[in-house]
């Protein structure tokens, strides 16, 4: 028998306590050979964030905690953070929240500090690091708060033996995304200045890396105060790619030596606003095919972009959101969101396109009858444009 009661007075089985006590926040997926890593923010551990590992022999749902107690993998660079760790050959390099220093944790060992203690505490902060094997160092963004006034940002090198960071690039207000070419001879990065935000206007720069590790002949490739460029990345063949909103849409480009070549122009967003470091919405398969995420008509999609045929094939998924995409040998992994299930870390077999859920962010089970599945809608707006929205139909 149906019972009618006033709006707002019915008792929902979904409570804030049940959601928080049984949930974690997943983020920052990384690949290191066949091993998959990601970060977990756990409310039951005081909100600390740690790195976990899933190996090829592990069962779905089974993970190994990498970060020991008393460490919290978070960076405060630009305050929004992101890009707090990387993994290379089984070693995890990370920023610790309490002191903002860089640490290395080798397999089976306790973390060792790499960067010096400074005054004031947390006066030097690090983010978005990449490995420079040839020079036995990390290249990362460094934010210096040791002097009064506004913080000074730079791209710097940190020796794997430890020590004071050595500045490689400076002079602008903000930096992000230092990315080394596969042969280690070129470094690309993103930079911008006040009053622009990174989704307003940025620049993509490129420099040669000399034998002594210094940079030579830095040059701006693309970008200006009205063009947002982000996510520089190198293909296996050593060609620089990036995302730009030069057309009004964040699309994928390839640097052709004189200009950026659009790979598949379309009215879709292949990136989002770069609020934090380490965002990843595309990667390369061994043959140079690009696996990418993009938002089309309000919904996130997963696709394969053939750079020779210039064709984009959508890979059907049950997800409405896909992010933190990482591509490796024969597999990809990403964070996925669904309208009816908790967010998850998902592994994709690139040969069969089979998807496996490795970790859910919540163990709470909600009766589907309480969930209003969203509908993507569009409607005309000013200037002759269409606006898009998500409509949740009443189910009671």
Please describe what each predicted stretch is:
Residues 91-107, 111-114, 128-131, 138:
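Hydrophobic or amphipathic alpha-helical targeting/insertion segments
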């Amino acid at each position: 028998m149906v019972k009618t009661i006033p709006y707002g007075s019915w008792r929902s089985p979904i409570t804030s306590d049940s959601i928080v006590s049984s949930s974690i926040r997943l983020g920052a997926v990384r690949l290191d050979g066949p091993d998959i890593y990601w970060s977990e923010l756990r409310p039951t551990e005081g909100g600390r964030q740690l790195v976990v590992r899933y190996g090829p022999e592990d069962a779905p749902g089974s993970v190994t905690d990498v970060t020991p107690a008393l460490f919290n993998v978070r960076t405060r660079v630009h305050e929004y953070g992101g890009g707090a760790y990387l993994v290379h050959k089984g070693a995890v390099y990370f920023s610790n929240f309490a002191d903002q220093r860089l640490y290395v944790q080798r397999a089976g060992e306790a973390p060792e500090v790499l960067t010096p203690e400074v005054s004031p505490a947390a006066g030097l902060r690090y983010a978005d690091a990449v490995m420079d094997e040839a020079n036995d160092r990390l290249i990362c963004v460094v934010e210096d708060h040791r002097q009064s006034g506004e913080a000074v940002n730079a791209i710097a090198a940190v020796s794997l033996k430890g020590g004071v960071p050595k500045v490689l690039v400076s002079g602008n207000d903000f930096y992000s995304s230092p990315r080394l070419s596969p042969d280690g001879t070129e470094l690309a990065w993103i930079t911008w200045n006040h009053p622009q935000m990174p989704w307003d206007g940025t620049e993509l720069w490129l420099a040669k890396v000399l034998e002594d590790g210094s940079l030579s002949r830095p040059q701006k490739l693309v970008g200006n105060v009205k063009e947002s460029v982000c996510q520089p990345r190198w293909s296996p063949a050593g060609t620089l790619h990036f995302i730009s909103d030069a057309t009004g849409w964040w699309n994928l480009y390839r640097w052709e030596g004189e200009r950026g070549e659009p790979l598949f122009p379309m009215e879709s967003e292949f990136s989002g606003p770069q609020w934090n470091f380490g965002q990843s919405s595309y990667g390369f398969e061994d043959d140079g095919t690009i696996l990418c995420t993009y938002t089309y008509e309000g919904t996130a999609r997963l696709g394969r972009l053939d750079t020779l045929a210039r064709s984009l094939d959508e890979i059907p998924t049950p997800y409405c959101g896909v992010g933190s995409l990482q591509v490796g040998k024969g597999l990809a992994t990403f964070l996925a969101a669904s309208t009816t299930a908790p967010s998850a870390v998902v592994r994709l077999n690139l040969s069969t396109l089979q998807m496996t859920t490795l970790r859910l962010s919540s163990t709470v089970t909600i009766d589907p009858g309480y969930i209003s599945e969203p509908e993507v809608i569009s409607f005309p707006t000013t200037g002759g444009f269409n606006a898009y929205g998500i409509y949740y139909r009443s189910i009671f």
